[in-house]
């Protein structure tokens, strides 16, 4: 049974006024009586709409600079009153039923994100009456529709037109879910902010006040259900943040291909985040969350050709990411050369999409352009807990490197060192990357000992016939022994970039000097587990 409820009276009180005038006009045109508060009421009146101020309805004025507006029995009784059960009480106290509540809340997140926001500013942007009305209406969804998203306005009017001015129970229930999600996210933001302010109240420094909150509340929205998880016996879904501030796999639009799998999304994220590190036209090919080929070039076609050469075997069935628009020539090269699961780029030309359309199973994603990297949090689930840390946005420039060996690197060695240092950040530890002329020539990933990662990188380069002599090597963490340097020298490496910091740094540097290798210290580690 649809259990339709007619909408005869609506209360509108919004902070974000986008679309509210048009929505109110549509409601009024359909005979809905409008109640409103403060700035919303003034806006509607200015537009010539018949609107009753809540203070006129309740007989009680707004007070305390707007802190008390809607906290009144005639408001909440009208929202919470059960039709057919509380009618006599409502009539006795002259409480009019309110059939729809349209509310969005004070902009707390935007307020605290502003530079120089004080605790007092934040406190004044904590909405009290709004969430109370939202929760009241959502609780009584059997009789009342609660609208918290402007994106729902058009659909609501259409349903009212299709149902003689009424909304179905299914719609009211769906709106109630959105309402509770809305207030949960809002309260979570406030709790996180206040939790991070605790040290300041204890007289600690401003730096201490920026620590993680003592309770972490997270809100993500389901974007899609997956066929299965990492393995076919695991169920899975993909959730995203509500307001993602940076182009990412979460914001990407799929323009063709089969539905993305759990592993597709994880691997695409790894590829895209790596390619973002480069200003020049770049290509990153990823397999099982590890780069297997990375290059920069004069064009993305040049970059792709060179990245593919690193490890054609592993590139089969991989994920390919670019930091420039996918063009027809590059699309044709990929489709003609290899099987690929996903291609992601900021955009794709019409000609490129015509070419990829010949391979309908290939997933093509466009994510838009990105600017500076946005600070945020990384999470790692452990059984019974959650590890939280800042995103690893650390990187070094040439001026920050320390040459610790007798020999200085050549200009090309230095360029290659900085290039493979960027790549190593995205390779699972222990990570070793060989690079020459702005392309990877060997990658050793995920080994339990660093020396074996170095050996594997050399083996991969040899297997593909790539010349290691004169190349640079990056290590995501320090070398605990000289054996990694000996392995690199045996392969032909002439420059090493690494964090330094081992108790055996002197032995490692001495080994580099013995082999005539230039060594650079970054004083920054890039573990990736």
UniProtKB/Swiss-Prot annotation:
Cross-referenced Pfam families: AICARFT_IMPCHas, MGS
Pathway: Purine metabolism; IMP biosynthesis via de novo pathway; 5-formamido-1-(5-phospho-D-ribosyl)imidazole-4-carboxamide from 5-amino-1-(5-phospho-D-ribosyl)imidazole-4-carboxamide (10-formyl THF route): step 1/1; Purine metabolism; IMP biosynthesis via de novo pathway; IMP from 5-formamido-1-(5-phospho-D-ribosyl)imidazole-4-carboxamide: step 1/1
Organism lineage: Bacteria, Pseudomonadati, Pseudomonadota, Gammaproteobacteria, Enterobacterales
Free-text note on domains in this protein's UniProt record: The IMP cyclohydrolase activity resides in the N-terminal region.
Annotated MGS-like domain residues: 1-148
Keywords: Acetylation, Hydrolase, Multifunctional enzyme, Purine biosynthesis, Transferase
One GO cellular component term noted in the UniProt record for this chain: cytosol
The keyword Acetylation appears for this protein: yes
HAMAP family found in the cross-reference section: PurH
Name of the protein described by the UniProt record: Bifunctional purine biosynthesis protein PurH
